[in-house]
Every structure is written in C-alpha cells, then in structure tokens.
C-alpha cells in the first residue's frame, strides 16, 4: 500500500484536496437523488463539508452530509484499491450528463495514508452505523459502530502521524482550501478551537459565585446599611485587582463563501458580487478598478451525428478532432468551403501527428499560374516539370506581395509553379509538412533550393564566381557579422541582390 500511495502522489498536501473532492461527489449524489425522492434528505437538508482539526489528540476529521455508504459500499469501495463508487453510480444514471463526478473514494481516498492512519465511520439512510478501520496495510476491520450516532453523514477520521501535525494548523487548512476547492459547489467550514487570553477582575471571577448568593438574598427582607464617610473614602482608594485567563471556545468559519460567479449569466451579477469575488481571489482590501466580462468557452451548437437519416447523438468529441469544422452543404459554395477549410486543415496538420498525411491532400492554395483559382497539392505535383525536384513555396503577408517578390523571378522564368502562402497560420504549420507525395517542400526565400541548369548556365556561373570573388569578399568584410556569407546567385533575373535565410532558420 505504501508503494502505491507514494507512486501516485509526490505532494502530501494533496490528501485534503482528494478527500474534499470525494465528499463533494457524495453531496452531488444525494442532491441528484433527492430531485426525484425528497425523502433522501430526511436525515438533514444542509449539504456541507466540515473540517475539524484536533491538535490535542492529533486527529483531523472531515464530515460530509452526502449520500453515505452502506456496509457493502465500505467493503467494495474502501476495501478495493482504486475502485470507484462514482463510476458505478454514473452507470446507473447515464442520462445525467451535466453532473461532474470525480470518483467517490477511488485512489484519491488512499492519499490520506500519506499523513495518517485512517478510520471512516459512516451511516447510510437505509442501514445502521458501521465503522471501517485500516492502517494502510493489506487488511481492514469492519464492525457496527456504537459510538456517537450520526445521521446520513460520512465521517472520515485521520489519526495523523507524529511528524505530520503541521496539517492540523489553521493556516495550512485555509491555504489548501483556497488553493484547490475554494469554488466547489457545497459549503466548506472549518471548526477551530480558540483559546484567547482574557483579562478579568476579581469581582468578575467571583461573579458566578455571587449570582447564586444574590438569588437567595432576593427572597430575604432588605436592610439598609449606611457606612461612614471614612469607609467611603477607603473604598474609592482601593483598586480592583485583575488577572489573565484563557477562555476556550470553538469557532466555525466558512472557507468558501465566494461562489463561482463565472458560471452565471453576466447580466445577473452585481458590482458588489464582483467586488467580493475580487477581494476573495486576490486577498486585497482595495476595490477593483474595472470589470470586463467575456466568454472564453462557447457551447458548440447545431452539431449532430446521423446515420441513414437517423439521429444518433449530439456530443461526439472523440469522433471529430477540434480542428475539424463544417458548413452546411451547398454546392454553389464549394469554392468558399475550399478557401475556409483549407486553412483549417493546416492547423490539423500541425496538431494531428497521426492524420497529417491524409489532411495534406485537402490543402488548396493559390499559385503563380492558377490566378484567382486555387490548386491542391496533388494537382501541383502532377503538373511539376520533370527537372523540378522540390515543391516551391513562398510565405508573405498577402498574395500581391509574394507575387511581386524578387524571390520568384528565376522560378517564373523557368516556368516552375510556386505556392503562395499568405495566411498567418501557413508559416506556423508548414514546418510540420516537410514533404508531400515524395516531394520535399522548400521555401524560395531560403538557401538550398536547386534549380536545373544547362551546360551554358553552369559555365556562366563558374565564370561569374571567379570574376566577382574579390567583390564578394569585400562585401562580406563590410557587412561583417550581419551576414553569414556573400555569394553569386543564379536565382536572380532583374533584381540586383536579395537576402536568403538558412534552410533550418
């Protein structure tokens, strides 16, 4: 058991978060069942989680008013590692798609053994009270509990190890609740034993005793005793003696008073609620400066899966990747579909390491020769000249910019097609698509692009290299570290020069 616990968890404080999550699950279950059977709440209608530290006995107790557990639940859920009661519950209520269930006493329950030995006492609505006890070994005991009777509650008692008493401190409990389950859907309260010093006088100390005497004196005849002036002066000069005592009491404090306002309609949220939320979240005393409300996650609508004209389901997240988007079928808008969906496919190529090759067949782009029409990569490859070894592309801000670029002069002269990439996503995703149909993709703005040359062109290049060798050396000395090297290029036609980047930049 110790090996399993320490394998799952490296941070000990996670145990409180896990136990609160389990308690929240139990509360969600009883709340759900009470919708159809109100008698489920006969044992108490308040749904809450209480945290009770006891430093004197080194015990930390968590009590929730959730669904509770039967004897069979204790054996099946607590007695079997990682068995999830919530999983079984969700199987019984599959139609409940909006209730979030994490896992009632699954592996998270065993995180308690990071800091403690464990006792769980529970009572279900329909059974007597049982106690389940285990010390992180391979065995546990289960017996009828004749201690303090509880209603529908589940009480989890942690007998902390000697070196783990820090988890009983008020500061730590509040810090963990604020960090993790602060906005959980049920009330979380901590019960703290306070012992402040109080200064009292001798008269106050004896007040309790005198109250009884005064009660008896009321029944006796009253007599008036008039003292002398000397006695009055003496009383005035006498000062009351005081001393300090410690007064014990239990303080209950709600730890999650601020509710998750982001789950509500912005029109229903007041400025006062926004202010309370801001101060609770930031621990600030000042008022917030301004409020900006905007949705960061929209509900998907109008998506349905139908087979043979029969509706199957509305939610199918696992069936379609996020990058796949659809428009209603309209043959007249096929061109628009190509323009829109082609760019979404680029995103899919970057995100989907399995299907990127299939998605690349859906890509459409403008090219040098296509004009206003778009060309697929498959059509591009089929029209490539025999001497062309790579798929040429150029990235720019817009189609007009790349069409007039000096980088495509030689390609145009030789009649090679160049793919125009003028969308922001193109440069980001082309890094993943390094080849298509056996042809590598190479940008004309980078070095390494080889264009076919005849014998005459090769001879001219050799002569030019010799003729302008000193000029290239001088240009490199002038530019120094601003460039890696200066060379003669056959890729220019009318432009005097151009700057290219390295292949892997």
UniProtKB/Swiss-Prot annotation:
- Indicate what this protein is called per its UniProt record: Putative heat shock protein HSP 90-beta 4
> What SMART domains does this protein map onto?
HATPase_c (SM00387)
Q: Where is it mainly found?
A: cytoplasm
The cross-references to Pfam families, in alphabetical order and at most eight, read: HSP90
Instruction: List, alphabetically, the GO terms of the cellular component aspect.
Output: cytosol; perinuclear region of cytoplasm; plasma membrane; protein-containing complex
Instruction: Output compositional bias ranges, type Acidic residues.
Output: 200-216
Subunit and partners: Homodimer.
GO BP annotation list: cellular response to heat; protein folding; protein stabilization
Subcellular compartments: Cytoplasm
Locate the region Disordered: 197-248
Q: Where in the chain are disulfide-linked cysteines found?
A: none
Q: Where does ATP bind?
A: 22, 83, 109
The UniProt entry, under InterPro entries, shows:
HATPase_C_sf, HSP90_C, Hsp90_fam, Hsp90_N, Ribosomal_Su5_D2-typ_SF
Organism name: Homo sapiens (Human)
Q: Which UniProt keywords apply?
A: ATP-binding, Chaperone, Cytoplasm, Nucleotide-binding, Stress response
* Its job: Putative molecular chaperone that may promote the maturation, structural maintenance and proper regulation of specific target proteins.
Record field: transmembrane? none
Show the GO MF annotations.
Answer: ATP binding; ATP hydrolysis activity; ATP-dependent protein folding chaperone; unfolded protein binding
Regarding protein family, the annotation reads:
Belongs to the heat shock protein 90 family.
